[in-house]
Amino acid sequence: MTLRSVQSRSKRKPIDVFDYSDEDDRVEEESKKLLRKFDSPVTKKHHCAIDKYEFLRCFAKDTQSESKVLQHIVIDVEVPVKEEPSRCELSGDGNSDLIDVISNGSHRRIGIDSLTSSSLSENDEVSTGEATNPASDPHEVDPENAQVLIIPDVIIYGDIYCTNSKLTFSRNCMNVESSSVNATKGTFSCQWTIEDIIKIESQWCLEVETAFVNVLLKSRKPEGVDIAKDISGIDLLKFSVYDPKWSKEVETIRSLDSRYKNIWFDTITESEEIAFSGHDLGTSLTNLADSFEDLVYPQGEPDAVVVRKQDIELLKPRRFINDTIIDFYIKYLKNRISPKERGRFHFFNCFFFRKLANLDKGTPSTCGGREAYQRVQKWTKNVDLFEKDYIFIPINCSFHWSLVIICHPGELVPSHVENPQRVPCILHLDSIKGSHKGGLINIFPSYLREEWKARHENTTNDSSRAPNMQSISLELPQQENSFDCGLFLLHYLDLFVAQAPAKFNPSLISRSANFLTRNWFPAKEASLKRRNILELLYNLHKGHDPSILPANSKSEPPHCGVSNRNDQETESENVIECCNWIKPFDGSSSTVTDISQTKTCSPDLILSKEVSYSGGYDPPSSKLRKVFMSPIVEEVQESCEKKDHLEMDIQKSTGHEIETLRKEGCMLYIEDSDDEEAVSVEYVSDSQDSYEVEMKVEDDDDDELIVTGESSGIHGSREIKSDSASIERVNKSRDSTAASCYNDFLLVLSDDERSSDDKENILISSNVMAKPKT
């Protein structure tokens, strides 16, 4: 037995080396934990650089503790950061990005290749914008040891825009790195200390769960960057980022340093304050939506657009207008063009490009060719595109609108001709240049080639010329916020149709004429289109369609003053019709809208001026530039004879005429409801920020009516001893920088002693008169 036991042990010795010991089991478990971190990204997504760092740390015995899975990007700093001057670099080399990292009191530069940047933005589940300490709550940040990384959708800084970027907030500075600059592979790297940051304005758009941020910085001009300064000494950096948890991330950034709390504001942009100051657009929309029923426009057409209540809601500030509003305005614009000129243009609706590029299937097709043509061939069955001068195509992709214009598609230009007058080309008009990459535009040449083949299959004409059409991305006015792209599309379209030449050559565009240049129009002018479209929908909803031309009329439709100047009676009737249905948008009615006996309409009608240029914004070039939205307001100015000097006649003054004051010294007339005699009210301009009017009554010189206010609003106070009249409402629209009554206020008087039925009549007859002081 002993012998057998010895033999057994001797046989087992050769295989003892294959048995697992406790130490081997421990190593195996550690290996499994490490390998889990390198699983397929489909299962778990981690930043490769961080995983390699943890892997090397473990095998270098740098730590004995179990490595925790990181959910956020954290950069540890061993010592307090030393603040150094801001620095920016713009490079045309697309091989790598440069990040300035401050450590141990000196700068170090870490190179990050484009693959790493891409993986950060596309493959990571890391919450872009949250900074954490591994041992603490995600939003309880130790500002000494953490930075906040944000992956913006787009960054705009002066004349450059970056689409593949990283933005980092730390306790002492803000860094920007990008590997895609102005749609090229150039790189951009910039750093600002927190002292360089003047203000941060953050806006949140719930509909698309995207934040839009303006960072105001102390001015400096990095090499290769042209900064347009609205205010001397201040630069503007803008970025947008999709992040459903943005509010928490803002708090995380604020927790880095108390100085962020002092400079970070949740606010609206300056352009919106200018565009909507003094007007309660929300009230207007609420009142309109309450009574709004589905609007079919144009009535009776098979492809009419149906505007619903939910579409009206999108006209509120800081919201994106949808395809319904775009298509509606395109239809309106098309109907405004005279039949003779209409044949030069062709307008596609918003669904055309979506169908052409096959956006409903996910990733857009940029090389459609025959397949793209077959998807939309029915759209042009009865239209020959090659007979048109201009073809307009609205584009929506990645929550952004832009416009494509195909010019002279049927024109064949011989190669030996220099500077031909008519050049076939494709124009791309984008209010955030670079947001829609060139690939989206490249689908049009191949589509036009297939369209040409289908139209000329029995001819020998050259069918290869369409793909060779030159594609041009224009330098145009850019939007000043991140939600007016649809309005810019419509304004581009509006102005182009109004100014489109019969013969177009992009190489002959004159910079001095501003056509299709950055100086084409003020950016704020496009933002004001939101209110103009609301006004148009209001009028159409009330049954006043300015685009309907009477069957027996050879002139333009009677929208606010468009008339034959030789026919005074027709002119008066047209103006009456317009002035009766234009209404203010302050949520209340106005005596102006109820005046049925109006016989004149001054060049600067108070109501028209108020609706057209809200907040005192009156672009100097707007009166000279004709657009297809403007006739509602501007053509009333042309229809009436302008008078620089009006005769003052108290005896002939009635409560039905309202004329804007054009001089610093003004005389107002108030008609008392108990007395037909007009009472004079003298305007006194003490300063640019305060306004007073004094009411002079013959019976008692001490009685006065005082209206005072600042640029933010005008408020009325009653100090008249007589009980014959009282102020019921003050409706203001005044430029805060003007020293005259150019945009006048309107006082509506009523008698408290009258019955409610009589008060209606009083509101019609008792109103403020305004004439220049003699």
Swiss-Prot record:
UniProt entry tagged with the keyword Hydrolase: yes
Gene Ontology biological-process entries: protein desumoylation; proteolysis
Annotated active site: 400, 430, 485
Top-rank taxon, per record: Eukaryota
InterPro entries: Papain-like_cys_pep_sf, Peptidase_C48_C
Coiled-coil residue spans: none
One example GO MF annotation: SUMO-specific endopeptidase activity
Record EC number: 3.4.22.-
Hydrolase found in the keyword field: yes
Keywords for the protein's UniProt record, in alphabetical order: Hydrolase, Protease, Thiol protease, Ubl conjugation pathway
Primary enzyme class: hydrolase
Stretches for region Disordered: 118-141, 548-568
Pfam families, A to Z: Peptidase_C48, PH_ULP
Primary role: Protease that catalyzes two essential functions in the SUMO pathway: processing of full-length SUMOs to their mature forms and deconjugation of SUMO from targeted proteins.
Family in the record: Belongs to the peptidase C48 family.
The protein's name: Probable ubiquitin-like-specific protease 2A
Source species taxonomy: Eukaryota, Viridiplantae, Streptophyta, Embryophyta, Tracheophyta
